[in-house]
Amino acid sequence: FPLLPLSKTVSFERKVLDIRQMPAQVLFPHWDDEFEFIYVLSGMMEFRVRQKAFLVSSGEGFFLNTGEIHSACTYQSYDCRFVIYRICPSVLFQTEDNPLYQKYIKPLVDHPSFGFLTFVPKVPWQKYILEMIRKMNDICERPVDGYELKINHFVNEIFYYIFHNVNL
């Protein structure tokens, strides 16, 4: 499952994976230079980040900051299909010297305790983020001209909710 760095012409990548079809049924430890949103489409898996293990079920998800080492594996006999969105920071703002990036995004992503977030539907603001990730998935399943603009919109909306709900 090696992912190559995103090119300068691509602002995000979407990949749907089945943990059972991966080598050794494992997403081996790795990190990415991009943000990642992970959404479990069906089943359950064990997800690891910062030496912590989480059981993630259908309808739940994760946010991973850039540079966070993470891995995943099967949990008991469960199958698991999940989607990963790798998002270039430029989706939020074209340059890091943008005042809005400096004011809202940089303090979050540079904070040492902000490595990841879990999203569960029982928390209202997290449920809303999960709904946005589902909408991103629907749009990517049936892309039409301009779909990248909708993805950009949802990513900005997600960061708005993260900014307003995460206390660092």
Please identify what each model-predicted range represents.
Residues 65-67, 73:
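Residue-level recognition of conserved beta-strand edge/terminus positions
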Residues 36-38, 84, 157:
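Residues embedded in well-ordered beta-strands
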Residues 16-18, 109, 162:
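Hydrophobic aliphatic residues
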Residues 1-61, 68, 102-103, 113-116:
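Generic protein-terminus/edge-of-domain signal
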Residues 1-13, 73-137:
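A hydrophobic/aromatic-rich effector-binding and dimerization subdomain
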Residues 120-168:
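An amphipathic alpha-helical interaction segment
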Residues 64-65, 87:
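A conserved hydrophobic position in a structured secondary element of the catalytic/binding core
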